[in-house]
Amino acid sequence: MPLRRGDGGDGRRTFELVDTAGADDDLDLLDAPHPVLLGGPHAVPRGTTFPLPPGASAPGASGPGALPPGAPPGPPGAPRVPGRRRVVAAAVATGVVVLVVGGMLVVDAATSRDARERLETARGAVRALDTAPTEQWRAPAAADRGTAFLPGLLVTVDGDEAVALDLDTGDEAWRVPVGGDEAVCGSWSPWERSAVPSRTVVCVAGSGVTPSWYDVSPPPRPREGTATVTVLDARGRVVGQRQAQTAGALLVPGPDGGLVRAERMGEPGEPSGAPVAVDPGAGESVDGVAGRDVVVTLEDAATGAVRWRRELPFQDVPWSCTSWDAETGGEEVDPERLLLVATETLVDVGGCGVAASFLPDGERLDDPDAPTDGAVPLAGGRFLVDADRQGSDGALRADRVLDPDGTPLLDVPGEVLDPQATDDPAPGVLLVRDGIALRAYDEQGARLWTFDGARVPEAVYVVAEGTAVVGTASTVVGLDALSGEQTWSRFVDDLAGERGHGAVVTQAFTDGRCAFLVLVDPATGASSRVVALELSSGSVVWSEDLDGGWGGLLPVQGRLLRWDGQTVALLG
């Protein structure tokens, strides 16, 4: 009598005993291949063993009441079972029931633990929110000088100190000096942040140290001198500290306890590129831009040992050397402009005449001979090499999807719509917009299905529990991730209510049962509403208006944080 598993909601699993008398068991089905889909049900791993109940014997064991080897069973319709044998039979039956119930409890615990671990590491995933979340705690925390996430901790910078807050309580876990009040700890990324916590946090402090992601005009210039590099573990202990020469280089915390250095080298070459109109009113222009090469190095932050070094020759990257000058109405040329972003999965350098993306081991993801392309991280650790990320040079090249190790997977016949939230850290489906159609591909690049709807798909908000939540200009649609069949549809204005005519979806999260959509009025942007839609039906489970001014929502290790730039709060 096998067990049929069902979803009891709230992350629980229920079981039903199914009578299979007279049914044939096809054991070959157990080894049949199964499709892997993002958000699909997760089985208990093979090899999982269940403990026997106290006093129960393993199959085939000897003992009181056991039949001798080869003994025939009793005849059908035996008139009576002796009392002692009835007791033994009852004990065996009780043991079987206890074994089944115990096995179900072990399966339930293993499933719940697996689901929780997946929600803590998947993109945009949060723990179960059965009702509208309320503020659990609030604490001061500025994000303008980087953030880092250690297991159970949020790390930010306060003056000359790195400060860690407990994600569950908001209490200060530790506070450590990092060598100066001009410091950067952790990183910042323009892409969806990885939910996997780091093992250490790297801080860089020194005169002129500024977040390199500030794309202001004019951008900050690296200064000559030294910077203090500090490496902290999850307990706030200093596991490494040294003085690093800046020598005019950009220094930012890098992946896996690393420090990334980017600097201009050599002398400018001959001008390249199209003429630049620096003052149209006066008829002034320059014949292209002459710039210097760039060297990117990843060092061990604690020891300074070089992990890898790459040289990037100056190239004609469209519009990378100029910015609009409001005073002259022309273009301002900045041949030294340099930007650097480093996360746990990607090192990306850009600026005048340079654009390159690297894995943490130094492997280059973009095409060195295509100055306009660049890599963007996708859900599940994959990457999209966007052929026109840095602009267009007129050449027709397809975007490419790469595996986490950089292996090409698919030349994209359209635009990848990457989900903002999943319930699995290893997605098995890729969604691509091709004209007005939405196409799904598996992990090997084979097409699964095509959905031709009445409206053009503009975004994929959530892919979880076998459902893809897709957005158009005015609707939110639920699609079966296995077949592409539409299962439900909702109008965005209906979800926004009276306050949100013309509202747009700006963020999305999931707990594996619901899709949580953040709706914002584009006219004001000051207030928003969070709506929870059941993935299987699209029905509204709850909705809540979020007042109190601007504040972005951030999923971190299964928790949902609200950040307004100066304070952070836990919603739950």
Describe these PLM feature segments.
Residues P2-G572:
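Secretory-pathway ectodomains
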